[in-house]
Every structure is written in C-alpha cells, then in structure tokens.
C-alpha cells in the first residue's frame, strides 16, 4: 500500500471526512445533472461512486451488502 495514496489519506482522516466527501460529490452530481455536459456529469458520477465505495469499506460493508438489501425489497 502506498502510504501517500489518496485512499489511505481518506481512511486516515476517518469516517466523518469520508462521509463529507460523499456529500460533496453528491451535490456536484446534482449540479451537473441539471446541465448538458455529459463528460462533467459522468466524471462527477464516477467521483461519487468512488467515494461511496470508500465509505462502504470504512463502515465494514461491500457493494454486495447493498445489492442484498435491494434484492430483499422486491
């Protein structure tokens, strides 16, 4: 693991910082969704998904845990 990596730095800052980043990226996705720039929308969506996956991992979950919840709803 690269001790200087962005992911490591997020984990070092803790769950509050990771959750804050998810919130920031979600707002950016909403802003870009209202415009017609496909590239910006997709890039912000990628940032949101990336940070959400980091948040899941920090909470001890994986994407499959979310998929299970969705499956159980139907």
Predicted segment positions?
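Flexible "arm" and connector segments at domain edges
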Residues: 1-45, 49-74
